A protein has these predicted regions:
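Metal-dependent peptidase/peptidase-like ectodomains
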Residues: 1, 22-24, 74-180
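Soluble metallo-hydrolase cores and metallopeptidase-like ectodomains found primarily
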Residues: 1-41, 51-67
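Short glycine-centered, acidic/aromatic-flanked micro-motifs in structured strand/loop junctions
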Residues: 31, 72-74
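Active/binding-pocket-proximal capping segment
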Residues: 32-33, 46-48, 68, 169-172, ...
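Alpha-helix N-cap/helix-initiation motif
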Residues: 36-46, 118, 143
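Short amphipathic alpha-helical face segments that pack within enzyme cores
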Residues: 44-52, 82, 86
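Hydrophobic, well-ordered secondary-structure elements that form the walls
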Residues: 50, 70, 154
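Acidic/histidine-enriched alpha-helical segments
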Residues: 63-71, 102-105
Length: 180
């Protein structure tokens, strides 16, 4: 193993799909592009999901009322959320005035992650998110207050957030497998 220390420039990839009625207003969908080691679950699954969401939204862009920004943060694992923190600092006024929600896409669809007992969301999104999870999975979810982690760098700007944590392994299965 080789450990490189020091400052480095990391690209922050962002796709913007402009809405037709209120293009200045936007939803920010984000995940992280860096990872420790292979990173299939954390966060190749999220990156693949965001690419597919971008493709579908682009195909249906004429129907979008508001803009969607999709960002892939560098420095999540290796910089303790440096990319999203930089973005929040750099675009704070725009985010505070125009971002209507931000959705984290970190490690969705991982193997055995079939439980929704620890879903991070702000209070104002509980009803909408609960309905979406029930409609898709048939499960009730247990909302939890978002932690100060996982690229949730926008809380101090007053933006609604959800899915810092989404599906996870059922507790019994984690114990059976000896996972923390």
């Amino acid at each position: 193993t080789f450990l490189e220390q020091g400052w480095t420039h990391c690209p922050l990839v962002e796709a913007t799909i402009t809405g037709s009625e209120e293009p200045e207003k936007f939803v920010l969908l984000h995940g992280h592009i860096d990872s420790w080691h292979v990173g299939i679950g954390d966060n190749a699954t999220g990156n693949a999901a965001m690419l597919e969401i971008a493709r579908i939204l682009w195909e249906n862009r004429a129907d979008l009322k508001r803009t969607v920004r999709i960002a892939w943060w560098p420095g999540h694992s290796t910089g303790r959320y440096a990319g999203s923190t930089w973005y929040a600092d750099t675009f704070a006024i725009d985010i505070a005035e125009n971002c209507i929600a931000h959705i984290n896409c970190d490690s969705p669809g991982c193997r055995w992650a079939t439980s929704y007992h620890d879903v991070s969301t702000m209070t104002e999104a509980v009803a909408m998110l609960g309905k979406a999870i029930a409609d898709v999975t048939g499960q009730q979810f247990q909302p939890e207050r978002p932690l100060r982690a996982g690229d949730i760098s926008f809380n101090n700007l007053g933006v609604t957030t959800f899915l810092m944590l989404s599906s996870t392994m059922p507790e019994e299965l984690r114990q059976e497998k000896g996972y923390y």
